[in-house]
């Protein structure tokens, strides 16, 4: 975090505007650097189900290349014409992970060439990037008891995620065509920028009572995404010969920009300050998570997502109580917080068992 502040004092003692403060700051709000690996033995499921589920119901001629067409051209054309789901089915078909039930253009049912049994699976995820915020601040003091503040924020998102899924098996029987290894890479790059603002006021109603109010606007993001994929399969034919097939589209999917509006928040606070004794404070804030929205709304995926957000999420109220007691050179502080769950109980199944309400306290 880095920043600077310039303070302007009004030399005219009769002017009711006493002070103006202007500042700028940059804060890296989130570091997206993360890396982890998972290893497991799965006795039930193979990655073949991913390609089967995407292919089921799709015509064979919509997920296969034309005669003489390259993998790259077919992958790009299928994505532009039909979309991402068809591309996943195309990868599964071209890599021989799945086969059509019938080899004709009208076929829409598929089977797996991965024999059932036990699977050794490893998953690795590597993330890079950051979320940052550049803020321009202005503060004003009116008379001796009213303070105004304004923040204008520019947000930055840079996120790159690279995943590798590797699966091996020794299932199946000799003389059977089968897939005994799958290596699947996916890369997602997300870039975005956004804008938000905060407006606040603090007033001293007396030497004892202070009151504050803050409005945090929504953050309006414009987000761009790119994806790329790579797939390898190891095959064993009917003569038990092993061969490696590389299905590399060598292409980047660049998607249409979309926008995200996060919820706004209002906050109110009051404090009772007793000189040489301490203080008591109370803060209340409200944020409506159901107002979060993706656009364009004519996109069926975003329309369904917005509907789910508005149904499953709700207002969240947060209450904070604090106190500080002074006793000679000793200072005792304590606080308690209550925050509602963001989930709408009427739309959450009892089997989901979701309760994200928060209660906490601190002493010092």
Predicted regions and their residues:
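Outer-membrane beta-barrel porins/channels
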Residues: 7-364
